[in-house]
Amino acid sequence: MGASGILQLPRERFRKTSFFVWVIILFHKVFSIPLGVVHNNTLQVSDIDKFVCRDKLSSTSQLKSVGLNLEGNGVATDVPTATKRWGFRAGVPPKVVNYEAGEWAENCYNLAIKKVDGSECLPEAPEGVRDFPRCRYVHKVSGTGPCPGGLAFHKEGAFFLYDRLASTIIYRGTTFAEGVIAFLILPKARKDFFQSPPLHEPANMTTDPSSYYHTTTINYVVDNFGTNTTEFLFQVDHLTYVQLEARFTPQFLVLLNETIYSDNRRSNTTGKLIWKINPTVDTSMGEWAFWENKKNFTKTLSSEELSFVPVPETQNQVLDTTATVSPPISAHNHAGEDHKELVSEDSTPVVQMQNIKGKDTMPTTVTGVPTTTPSPFPINARNTDHTKSFIGLEGPQEDHSTTQPAKTTSQPTNSTESTTLNPTSEPSSRGTGPSSPTVPNTTESHAELGKTTPTTLPEQHTAASAIPRAVHPDELSGPGFLTNTIRGVTNLLTGSRRKRRDVTPNTQPKCNPNLHYWTALDEGAAIGLAWIPYFGPAAEGIYTEGIMENQNGLICGLRQLANETTQALQLFLRATTELRTFSILNRKAIDFLLQRWGGTCHILGPDCCIEPQDWTKNITDKIDQIIHDFVDNNLPNQNDGSNWWTGWKQWVPAGIGITGVIIAIIALLCICKFML
C-alpha cells in the first residue's frame, strides 16, 4: 500500500500540472494570441514583396480585379484639364467590365451636358451602373455644348470607373472616376466565426454620421463644351459665378464659396454676377491627405486677399438656359443594356478596411445652403451699384472694384466642415501662370478621336494619339501609367524631335502612396482585429497591423516601376525606329553599287543625311534607376535554412512567448510540488 501511495502521488501531481498546461493552451487558442506580431515600423515593403513572391495561386478565387485611379499617378484633376482627356466618337460600341475593389478617389466627376436644342449629349446609364462609391470631391458639371455625336470616350485609353463596373464611355448624371483595371493575386482569407457580418454597400451620399468619409459636391456651369471656346464657371448660386481656372484646387473653391457668402459678394439682383480671381492670388492650398488625415486648412481667405476682378458682359456670356439644366437622372431607372448581373450582391471584401479614426460629418454641397455666418456689413448703395455693374444684363461699366473700401475679414464659423474637408494639393499638375484679367479662361477643343472605326478600344486610342494637338505642359510631365507611354509614341509619330541626353530626373512625387480601398462591404466590417492569415498556411495565427500601408507601398512602387519601364521602352522605340531607317539605307552596300553614279548622297541628296543617334546612355540610366529602386533593395534570404516562414527576426517575439510559456510551466510545477 505504501509503495502504491508513493506511486500515486507523482501521478496526481502530473494531473494537476497537465490541467494548468491545458488551460494555458486553450486560453491561447480561444484568444488567438499570435506567436509573432508584425508592426508597422518593423514590416518593410521588401518583406511584403517577399511574402507575395513566395505565395502561389492555388485557385482562381485568389485573382482579384482592382480599379486603380489615374489621380494616384499624379495626373491633373481640375475640371478644365480633366475634360481635355475626354472626347466624342461615333461608331465604337461601349465596353463594360466588372471589378471587385477600388481606391478611394479624391476627385470624381458628374456630367450633364445638353445640346443647344435641349437634347442630351450623353447616354443614360444602364441598369446596374451606379455612382462611384468613394469620392472626396464630386465635380458636377452641367451646361451646353455642340456634342459632335457618338459617345464620350477617354482619349488616353483609360476606363471610367463606376460602382464595381468600369465602362469605356461616360454616362449622364452618374459619378465616375478615371482609372484602369489591375488584377492582383491575393492570399486566401481564413474564415473565422469572429468575422464581422456584411454591412451596407458603400455610397458617397449618406446620412450616417458614423461613416468614415466626407463627400463635398462642387457645381460648375460650362458653355460650348468640347470646343475651342469652352468656358467653365464655378457656381456659387444660381446667379453668382466665378471664372474657373486650372490652378484652382477643390479646397480653394470650398473656401472661396464660404468667402463669397460671408462677404456678401453674391448677386443681389435678378442678373448673373461673374467674378474673376486676381491671377496673383495663391490658390495652391491643401495636400495629399485623403480621409485618414483630417487636417484643418492652414489659411483662410478674405475679400481683400482674393482681389475680385469684374468680368464685363462682352467678355463672358453665360447662357440663361444653363441655370435651368435639368437635374441628373437617377442611375437606377435606365433603359438599354442591363449590367446588373455583372455586380455580385454578396461579393466578399478583397482587402480588409482599416478603422479610420476621427469624427466626420454629413456630405456637403458647396452650392447648397450657406454654412457660414453672414457678414455683419449690410449691402449698401455702393455695394449695390458695384454688383449691378457686373451682372451680365447691362453693358460694361466702370470698374469700381479698385475703389471699394476694405472690409474686416469675416472668418467662416462652420468649424465642423473645415475640419472634415480634406486638404489636397497637386502642385505638379496645376497651372500657376498668371492669366489676363480681361480674357476669359478657355480650354482646348475636344478633337474627335478619329474617323476610322477600330475593332478594339486600344486601337482607337492609338489612332487618336496620332492626331496632332496642343498638349498642356503639365500633362507632358505627368508620371501617368498611360499618359507618358501614349504621348511618347505620339511625339515619335508626329515627328517631334528630342535633344540627345536631355532626360532629367523627375523631382516631383511619382505617385501618391496614401491609397485606400473600398469593397462591397462597408469599412465597419473590419473594425477590430482582422483575422488575416499572412501568405500561406505556415503563418497561421499571424496578423499584422501594417497590411494596408505596405500594400499601398507595393502598388506605389509598381506604379513607379511601370512608369520608369515605360520611359525606357519609349527610348528603345525611338532608337529602333532610327536604326531601322539607317539599316534601310545601308550606305556601304548602296554606295558600292552606286559608285558610278556618285554614291547614295549624290542621288538622294539631303535625305541621306540621317544619322542614328546614340540613346544608349539614356536607356542605361533608366535601367540602372530601375535596378537601384527595385533590385538593389535586398530582400530576406529565401534559402536561409533556419527560416522557412518569414525570417529569423519574426521568430524573436515567438521565442520570447515560448520562453515565457516554459517559465510559466516550470513555475506551476514548482508551486504544485510545494503545495502537495
UniProtKB/Swiss-Prot annotation:
Transmembrane feature ranges: 651-671
Site (Involved in receptor recognition and/or post-binding events): 57, 63, 88, 95, 170
Low complexity bias (residue ranges): 361-374, 423-440
Residue ranges that the UniProt entry lists as topological domain Extracellular: 33-650
Topological region Cytoplasmic: 672-676
Other notes: Filoviruses entry requires functional lipid rafts at the host cell surface.
Function text: GP1 is responsible for binding to the receptor(s) on target cells. Interacts with CD209/DC-SIGN and CLEC4M/DC-SIGNR which act as cofactors for virus entry into the host cell. Binding to CD209 and CLEC4M, which are respectively found on dendritic cells (DCs), and on endothelial cells of liver sinusoids and lymph node sinuses, facilitate infection of macrophages and endothelial cells. These interactions not only facilitate virus cell entry, but also allow capture of viral particles by DCs and subsequent transmission to susceptible cells without DCs infection (trans infection). GP2 acts as a class I viral fusion protein. Under the current model, the protein has at least 3 conformational states: pre-fusion native state, pre-hairpin intermediate state, and post-fusion hairpin state. During viral and target cell membrane fusion, the coiled coil regions (heptad repeats) assume a trimer-of-hairpins structure, positioning the fusion peptide in close proximity to the C-terminal region of the ectodomain. The formation of this structure appears to drive apposition and subsequent fusion of viral and target cell membranes.
Quaternary context: Homotrimer; each monomer consists of a GP1 and a GP2 subunit linked by disulfide bonds. The resulting peplomers (GP1,2) protrude from the virus surface as spikes. GP1 and GP2delta are part of GP1,2delta soluble complexes released by ectodomain shedding. GP1,2 interacts with host integrin ITGAV/alpha-V and CLEC10A. Also binds human CD209 and CLEC4M (collectively referred to as DC-SIGN(R)), as well as human FOLR1. Interacts with host entry receptor NPC1.
Sequence similarity: Belongs to the filoviruses glycoprotein family.
Protein name per the record: Envelope glycoprotein
Naturally occurring in which organism (per UniProt): Tai Forest ebolavirus (strain Cote d'Ivoire-94)
Encoding gene per record: GP
